[in-house]
Amino acid sequence: MKLSKLLQLAVFSSLVTSKNIFDLESLKQGLQDEETVNNDKREPVNLLYLDRFKMGVSDEAKGNAKFKRDPKNVIDPASLKEGSAEEEQKDKREPKNLFNLQALHEGLKDEETKSKREAKNLPNLEALEEALKGGSLPKKDAKNLIDLVALKQSLEKEAAKRDAKNIPDLEALKTGIEEEEGQVAKRDAKNVINLSNFIETPSKREGKNLFDLTKFQQSGQPIKKRDQKILKQEKSLFVLNSVDCFNNLLQSILPQLSSISIFSSYIRQFASIDARTANPQKVMLIVAPDNDSLETKLSDLKPWEFPEQITPEQSEQEQDKTLKNNLLHFLNGHLINNFEENLVIDKSSTDAVTIISKLNNGKFLKIKQDQLSQKFSIRLLDSENWIDVETIKQVENGFVLIINDSLVKP
């Protein structure tokens, strides 16, 4: 009996005796009986018999009934060596795209033995030279060239043609003018200036805007402060251009002169001096250094920095007073109050008109005007160097002389 039937009987017997209780004793007996019975066991599935596998391998190793299969993807060095030997015995194929230098060399030798063909489009210089020497080379007619001989002949033929119209005959015109000059008297020209009248030297007219200094001429005695006398003389001295004369006051003209803007600002800092420039009743002379001279000709100092120097011991008020006194000292060395009342004429110079006047700082100033060039120059009486006056301006109450220098220096 099969094990399944025994299990069914055991279950059934257990159910009869008791419910839900297994009879382990009967189950054990049934299993023992099952082992004694020759029942055909079913063959197991998915089992690997190693003995069979071992026997197959041994048989294959012995080479009794089976042959080894050839290995794949394995290099056989012996066959490779034999193949190389066989390859060496075969004829090598000819390479492609390679020059056969030997054949090329032989071809060049054969080419040298053959006669060379004549080159095309190349000049034969030897034949050309022989043709030029022999003079046998025919000349061809030039193109696009003017035939001067033919042109000359055509012009000569053209001259024989009829007279041209609307063309003046200059030769006939010249002849007619010459005949007319011999027969007819010339009429007076209109609107023509007679230059000969200007070549003559007429008497000079009296100049305008002249500063009459005749009443200030000295009596010929040496110049001394106490003995100065002003005499009249019917003659005008300095001559000025009308473009340098203005019908306004010094206070108005000074701001218009940009070249002396710095010096003009110094004048405006002192109310008393600025008031004199606005007084039309008093004549004042101003010798004004230009801006360039104030920056370059004072030894890198400012006009308020000399002659007195500021010390650290001074108070702020004392320093301001020193600066103000220095600047006033600089201005007084360039100003002349009541100019008409403080000048004399110097007769020692014959080629120029020269006058002498006293500056506000007590020094004497010479002013001269060259009679030929009409240019002005000035110098201090204790100096030998003349300073050219760059520009001079005259107004109702004084003069402004602009110089590129300074009369007061450190």
From Swiss-Prot:
Coiled coil: none annotated. InterPro entries: Mug57-like. Transmembrane segments: none annotated. It comes from the Eukaryota. Keywords: Signal, Vacuole. Residues 247-407 form the FAS1 domain. Residues 64-73, 83-96 have a biased composition (Basic and acidic residues). Residues 64-98 are annotated as: Disordered. It is found in: Vacuole. Residues 1-18 form the signal peptide. Its main location: other. The keyword Signal applies. This is FAS1 domain-containing protein CaO19.3004.
